Amino acid sequence: MARMKRLAGMALAAGLVIGGLAAVGTVPAAAAPATCSGSKTLNGTLADGSTYLIQCPAGAWNGTLFLYSHGYVVPGEANPAQDGTDPVTEGWLLDNGYAIAGSSYAITGWAVKSALTDQVATVNVFDQSFGRPSHTIAWGVSLGGMITAGLIQDYPSLFSAALPLCGVLSGGVATWNTALDGAFAFQQLIDPSVQVVHITDPTGNLTSGEEAVTAAQATPQGRARIALVAALDDTPGWFNPTSPEPASTDYATQEQNQFDWDTQVTFPFVLDFRAQLEAVAGGNPSWNTGVNYAADLAKSADLAEVKALYKAAGLSLSKDLQTLNSAKRISANPLAVTYLAQNIAYNGEISVPTLTVHTIGDGLVVPENEQAYRAVVDRDGRGALLQQLFVSRAGHCEFSPAEIVTAMQVLLNRMSTGHWNVPSPADLNKDAAELGPSFNIISVNNAVVPATPAYADFSPTRYLRPFDLFPFPIL
């Protein structure tokens, strides 16, 4: 149960459960467009069963709609419509004249396909109810950051700008390939009984993996191998959002943090929730045929840690890498790859100003996702439209409302001036601090705690398993 509590905390950080939402009703009868003001709230049900939520400001609407895409919801869990990350950020938007909206998506789990159409349908409901906005800004967190980037790629005419936060911006194929690499190394070196694809008993599979990794953590050899598993995912050695980043050579603390990422966050996705992905994709969409794990480790941000822990444990790193490279490989179902590429991988064809934000200590959606997205956008010649910001904090989507609002102001300034005027990290932090204590908070383990603004200079390393649609999909 501890892991599910931690996932609930991650959902909280990703803006899933910070505040209550209005009850969901039915689709309103068609009528002439009304004025989006007076704190009007509109909720209802779309044709596929997804629900939507729209809120209007108390005063005059300024003509801009913020369309929010929420993050991953554990399969089978409650899935209400959401129109923002948290009450503080939502309140700032409404107080400043913006309308806000979002949907629940028709399914839980890997819901990208339904999310894209449900979000567009929600915009259509807004248009029919209040008239078409002058500007619609797509934004979202985690899987919702991925959906945000998908919306501006697939429906460019609907949007004026985008703000993907902690987004899965390497795309679905690369993300699940990377997840397979870590799981495969875990299977080969620590728990041969675990299933990494075609999972028949997700709950039992996860339990087996958790028991094995906990046993491994008790020995130097096991800890070295856990670090290798983490390195093939580029999992950072920083876990607690309220703790400072470990020193660059504090490998013991880094490995403990990677163990915490595995047991409290990552393993449920790779050993349990993958089964839901394969169900919607129609098969296994991931492969490691042709992967050279020694070469990938050489490019990993965690290389020095792995070498040091293997040496301390008296283990042969080259022997374990040879075990991985000589093991029987896993092939993908081509139709499932096509499904996941459609839902979604990126071609770099952005046509609106796009600002991404990522914590540097994110072990679920690693910051290297930003490098993958930057690479494909630059390769398509659209790099001038993209800016990327980083927050020096551990955790997945562990942004304060102040940091989110500050990013929104950067994006809004780009929309109004036609050029990027991105302040330095110090100035961004000053702007965030000036919003006051009620904005400078984060949620940690279901508790709200103060947070100092933490924008910082950062350059992520290369994403280890790239896959994109530039210039054409090659499946």
Indicate where each model-derived feature is located.
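Repetitive helical segments and hydrophobic/amphipathic motifs
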Residues: 14-15
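Bacterial N-terminal signal peptides that target proteins for export
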Residues: 1-11
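C-terminal His-loop and adjacent cap/lid subdomain of alpha/beta-hydrolase
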Residues: 32-475
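C-terminal region of N-terminal signal peptides and the immediate post-cleavage residues
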Residues: 8, 18-35
